[in-house]
């Protein structure tokens, strides 16, 4: 599939002789607006709070440190603004009111071009079929004459005035409409839907909706209709409750997609906890559970993998899958929606008939640049919260982010310099100093009463650390029953205060007891993974205690590739206003005579084990939402398949001469 064509952005080239002109009272205003739609917000100005709320609605937050926030107006952000009710004049007039300088003409023109076309074309589902509808005759003629759209339609709707689209081609049609500057409106008139049976579901009186969650839902619902789109909230701030509230508002059949079976269990548990939904009205579709709601109407919770699987299924699983395909869903909730652009998962959207989509995520970033595809796969971004603002109000925990540099021992570093890339990576993770620092931090925080999660992408290192330090661990092959048992023990048993997790713990695991996180290895420079892991401790129960902080440690071996990737990983969190403290050394670690791998003999034994590890053991665990991006450092001979080959230059034997007159003895003599 071709890459989506990103709509144009505002540029100065349209009006090359225009200058930025400061208003007379500009000093008191909170924002600067540049030619290209870049907006700088000064958070220390009196009206900065109102300006920030407005900018979140019309622009993409790029960076939000303490004093200065940076936003970018894009075509997609303007589509989202219009989708929640803002008009062209609303956007231009409000932007001008907050701006220190007069709005550049390039920005005015760009806003006008992007917003006037929005809303003229709707995507509607009727009886499990999709239709493009418009009340504008000229727009209808333009759509029906477009070669790409025409090739994916199957005629007019029965009522006329609309084009019928093949279900499998909806994604391509939505993409094409964005390219021609006619983004589709996807709204569901659920109050007037008499075809789908209404669910008996309401929030319990004890369920409390926070102010920012209410803002999210107001962006999604308006005039009795539900808009398709994406809501971005920090980890631990209650994305699941937002989804559950949306379900209880629409009150129609709902399909919830998660990234793991553990997440499925948590969605079901919280649905029953926060609503009055009957237990037999919530079904699970996982490898262990094949359930369907009573009376054929209710909520089904499953994983992306279960729906995307193309192999042969068991009879029971195939039966549930057929029911999912045949059912007309009022709402499709996509948890951790950033995984959807992966080719394996995006086909899920065409498998099920649905009126409305709600995407939930904390990190709207990917390393493969496919995040833009969500604008036509799901819909516009409806709301994105400010992490630091929620932290200041006590909705998520205050965090101390610390990067600890761990010096490599001589033997380990000598091998590190000479080994192939994958084994070098394991050597930097198994660094004895990192082992000792990890042990020290665990002991320190356990003595303070903290609950600790240690993350490792390397399964070899995960097992080695956990077994050496005597802690339970969870990774891919760990059975569902064993996973739930370990997590339950971690939450309730005062003796089990530390657990080790592989990539399977990156997302959708709710552990409000955790107050400290230690990262010993990671997925190269993935910004998303860094933020997702931080989210495991943002929901700490004790977050409102006076002066309480949670701790996020990233252990990095000095003078290795880990230092380069660490700086890349931190960029998303820095853009959210977090700062990292760097510890170049912890003296207490060296003073402990009883720490692990203290002697040279123990370190050499550890090194021997790493060098003898098989190629299979060197692999990192693949997560279910892998982005398909692989980072590696290698040599040209590896790329060309010459790892097992060597170039040797042999000198010709000395003292031998060719016979006179031999053809091989002839020399070339250039003409003078």
Swiss-Prot record:
Residues 650-672 are annotated as: Disordered. A motif (DEAH box) lies at residues 335-338. It holds the Pfam family ResIII. It catalyses: Couples ATP hydrolysis with the unwinding of duplex DNA by translocating in the 3'-5' direction; ATP + H2O = ADP + phosphate + H(+). Residues 661-672 have a biased composition (Basic residues). The keyword Isomerase applies. Residues 220-382 form the Helicase ATP-binding domain. GO terms for molecular function: 3'-5' DNA helicase activity; ATP binding; ATP hydrolysis activity; DNA binding. Residues 436-594 form the Helicase C-terminal domain. InterPro entries: ATP-dep_DNA_Helicase, ERCC3_RAD25_C, Helicase/UvrB_N, Helicase_ATP-bd, Helicase_C-like, P-loop_NTPase, XPB/Ssl2, XPB/Ssl2_N. Belongs to the helicase family. RAD25/XPB subfamily. ATP-dependent 3'-5' DNA helicase/translocase; binds dsDNA rather than ssDNA, unzipping it in a translocase rather than classical helicase activity. Component of the general transcription and DNA repair factor IIH (TFIIH) core complex. When complexed to CDK-activating kinase (CAK), involved in RNA transcription by RNA polymerase II. Also involved in transcription-coupled nucleotide excision repair (NER) of damaged DNA. In NER, TFIIH acts by opening DNA around the lesion to allow the excision of the damaged oligonucleotide and its replacement by a new DNA fragment. Component of the 7-subunit TFIIH core complex composed of XPB/SSL2, XPD/RAD3, SSL1, TFB1, TFB2, TFB4 and TFB5, which is active in NER. The core complex associates with the 3-subunit CTD-kinase module TFIIK composed of CCL1, KIN28 and TFB3 to form the 10-subunit holoenzyme (holo-TFIIH) active in transcription. This is General transcription and DNA repair factor IIH helicase/translocase subunit XPB. It comes from Encephalitozoon cuniculi (strain GB-M1).
